[in-house]
Regions:
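Active-site acidic carboxylates
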Residues: 1-108
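Internal catalytic-core helix/loop-beta-alpha segment
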Residues: 91-139
Length: 139
C-alpha cells in the first residue's frame, strides 16, 4: 500500500453534487448510479475519506449542481442532454428533499460552498477556480 501525505496548505477535497437526489435511496438519480457506486465502494470510501480529511484540517469544498426551479430553462436554445434530463426530472429541485444536501456528505461549518454549476463542469460559470487559486490549493 502506498502512503501519500497531503499538506493542508495546498490541498482541498472537492465534494461534487452531494444532494439527496444523487446520493440517497429514493433520490431521482440514485438508481442510475447505484450499481457503479456499490461496485467501487463509493459510499464506504466517502465515509472513511471525509472524516480523515477533516481530521487532517484539509479544506473541504462543496461543488453543488444548480437546484432546479420552475422556469430555469425557459427560452434556452442550446440545452445539453444532461440539462434536458435534469429539467424533465426536476433534479435537485430547490425546496425539496432531493435538493437538500445529503446528511453525511453535505457541508459542515468551515467548508467552502462554491456557486452552483449548471452542467457537468464545476468550473464553468462558478467561482471554483477563483476559490482554489485564492486559497492556494494546487492538489
Amino acid at each position: 500500500m502506498t502512503t501519500t501525505n497531503y499538506s493542508a496548505d495546498d490541498t482541498a477535497l472537492l465534494i461534487v453534487d452531494p444532494y439527496n437526489d444523487f446520493m440517497s435511496k429514493g433520490g431521482k438519480i440514485y438508481e442510475h448510479t447505484k450499481e457503479t457506486a456499490e461496485a467501487v465502494g463509493f459510499y464506504d470510501n466517502m465515509r472513511k475519506m471525509i472524516p480523515a480529511v477533516r481530521a487532517a484540517h484539509i479544506q473541504v469544498i462543496i461543488v453543488p449542481h444548480h437546484r432546479w426551479r420552475e422556469g430555469d430553462y425557459k427560452g434556452w436554445k442550446h440545452m445539453n442532454p444532461s440539462q434536458i434530463r435534469s429539467n424533465e426530472a426536476r433534479s435537485f429541485a430547490a425546496g425539496t428533499w432531493g435538493g437538500e444536501f445529503h446528511p453525511e456528505f453535505g457541508p459542515r461549518e468551515g467548508d467552502v460552498i462554491v456557486l452552483e454549476h449548471w452542467a457537468q463542469s464545476g468550473f464553468a460559470n462558478t467561482d471554483l477556480d477563483s476559490q482554489l487559486k485564492q486559497r492556494g490549493f494546487r492538489k
